[in-house]
UniProtKB/Swiss-Prot annotation:
Self-association state and partner proteins as the record states: Interacts with SDHB within an SDHA-SDHB subcomplex. Also interacts with the iron-sulfur transfer complex formed by HSC20, HSPA9 and ISCU through direct binding to HSC20. Binding of SDHAF1 to SDHB precedes and is necessary for recruitment of the iron-sulfur transfer complex by SDHAF1.
The keyword Repeat is assigned to this record: yes
Sequence motif: LYR motif 1, positions: 14-16
UniProt-recorded name of the protein: Succinate dehydrogenase assembly factor 1, mitochondrial
Function: Plays an essential role in the assembly of succinate dehydrogenase (SDH), an enzyme complex (also referred to as respiratory complex II) that is a component of both the tricarboxylic acid (TCA) cycle and the mitochondrial electron transport chain, and which couples the oxidation of succinate to fumarate with the reduction of ubiquinone (coenzyme Q) to ubiquinol. Promotes maturation of the iron-sulfur protein subunit SDHB of the SDH catalytic dimer, protecting it from the deleterious effects of oxidants. May act together with SDHAF3.
Location of region: Disordered: 74-115
Keywords on record: Chaperone, Disease variant, Mitochondrion, Primary mitochondrial disease, Repeat
Noted disease: Mitochondrial complex II deficiency, nuclear type 2: A form of mitochondrial complex II deficiency, a disorder with heterogeneous clinical manifestations. Some patients have multisystem involvement of the brain, heart, muscle, liver, and kidneys resulting in death in infancy, whereas others have only isolated cardiac or muscle involvement with onset in adulthood and normal cognition.
Organism: Homo sapiens (Human)
UniProt key word Zinc: no
Subcellular location: Mitochondrion matrix
Additional observations: Riboflavin supplementation, which is used as a treatment in SDHAF1-deficient patients, enhances SDHA flavinylation and activity and reduces levels of HIF1A, HIF2A and succinate.
Length: 115
């Protein structure tokens, strides 16, 4: 087996440090493992993305070590049951209107009556 590159060693070290820092915090170890597993398939050539994720992980490590973090979780959008276009309380998306009140230019949406 070939030796790990410097970046690979840094990522592995970050993984171990995050697991250590997350001990005793509900959801932390599972979240760390899931996050690393999600990005494990990144190609080695995608160095910019790997470095970005590494920096993001270092910031998360600092937060975990700071003592202010008592647990670790993530905001997730609930999946809609099969056959329904959106989740609970979501309006159906007809594809014609933007998802927010501003269109792609950032200008407010105008109503048909001109207001």
């Amino acid at each position: 087996m070939s030796r790990h590159s410097r970046l690979q060693r840094q990522v592995l070290s970050l993984y171990r440090d995050l697991l250590r820092a997350g001990r005793g915090k509900p959801g932390a170890e599972a979240r760390v493992r899931a996050e690393f597993r999600q990005h494990a398939g990144l190609p080695r050539s995608d160095v910019l993305r790997i470095e970005y994720l590494y920096r993001r992980g270092r910031r998360q490590l600092q937060l975990l070590r700071s003592g202010h973090a008592t647990a670790m979780g993530a905001f997730v959008r609930p999946r809609a049951p099969t056959g329904e276009p959106g989740g609970v309380g979501c309006q159906p998306d007809d594809g014609d209107s933007p998802r927010n009140p501003h269109d792609s230019t950032g200008a407010p949406e105008t109503r048909p009556d001109g207001r």
